[in-house]
Amino acid sequence: MPIPPPPPPPPGPPPPPTFNQANTEQPKLSRDEQRNRGALLQDICKGTKLKKVTNVNDRSAPVIEKPRGSSGGYGPGAAALQPKGGLFQGGVPKLRPVGAKDASEAPAGKPALQVPSSRAAAPRPPGSAASGRPHDDTDSNRASLPELPRMQRPSLPDLSRPNTASGTGMKHSSSAPPPPPPGRRANAPPTPLPLHSNKAQAYNREKPLPPTPGQRLHPGREGHPAPPPVKPPPSPVNIRTGPSGQSLAPPPPPYRQPPGVPNGPSSPTNESAPELPQRHNSLHRKTPGPVRGLAPPPPTSATPSLLSNRPPPPAREPPSRGAAPPPPPPMIRNGARDAPPPPPPYRMHGSEPPSRGKPPPPPSRTPAGPPPPPPPPLRNGHRDSITTVRSFLDDFESKYSFHPVEDFPAPEEYKHLQRVYPSKTNRAARGAPPLPPILR
């Protein structure tokens, strides 16, 4: 059988020579056709003479030059180019003089240009409103009209914002044009900054965001407005009013220290220094009532934690702890529902959480000093883990209804049977294995 297959390949090669012969024979037979083909190829290679059209260049030039060169002649043309990309080519350079001089170009009567001018004035009022809202009455009046076009075309203001920022920089000499938000913050500090800082801190505790640390950096640099932000924390919780009045001196350092070293690992060491006086204060306050001892640590720990790199976890935990300070177990349940494993390790990381977990169990351990804090959090962590497991089981059982054991049928009686496996039997009993089949 192996011998016959080779013969078919030899007959295969003959066909290719036939194709080669055919290819070679065709040009020999049709030399006239080759000449015609050569002539066609020459014509194709030469190509047709193209006329140099200058009108195309003239057409393209005025489309770009119309909005740029003619400031007042092509009012309708500019209006027609609004939805296209030409608006940004012509509108962007026109926004700069509009931001600098609104009264001079207002009588020109260009509805298409007035809308971007109003947009240029629009981003300022929200910044002033966020800082304190008593900034400019004229800007607030202008903001009412341009808000509608903004909603209709959200993409336009995004592209024109850098120019509008430069236009606003002309009016506000103290603000830096490239970053509008910090510029707006820099404008407000003289009068409305304390109000703005109070609102910012109350909002930061609820939802910490990246821009908010920037707002805190400004009051921290000025130094004077730092104490007023310390006062608003006691307002939300009545329990903090007493300790806050006495602990006004220690809190300012945590506000001023984090800006200097916010990201470094030495931040906990800096935070530990202000915590010590507060711990002493908490010890002195525990004599009248232990509830006050619970209250002071959360504010101190909440403020530096918000300034730390990981704002979300502290934001989730403080509200649950502040919601019901007296009963610790329910607060831990809330934490366990969100993420059971993280709470114990999170308490292990920082020095502040030990202060949180430290006061509740026994007041007698606290006077021992700074060395004992590590062991209590470990014990509290184990207790909390047990309580979280129990509470989780209770909640799990309460959600579902289980059948009693009596409802299920009785299991079948177990009968011991000796099972025989052929692989475990002796070869002698099985006999000799069969001979392998003979290959033919």
UniProtKB/Swiss-Prot annotation:
Compartments (UniProt record): Cytoplasm, Cytoskeleton
Molecular-function annotations in GO: actin binding
Region (Disordered): 1-38, 56-386, 419-440
Top-level taxon of origin: Eukaryota
Region (Binds actin): 49-52
Gene Ontology CC annotation, any one: cytoplasm
Domain WH2: 36-53
Family: Belongs to the verprolin family.
Listed name of the protein: WAS/WASL-interacting protein family member 2
Record organism: Mus musculus (Mouse)
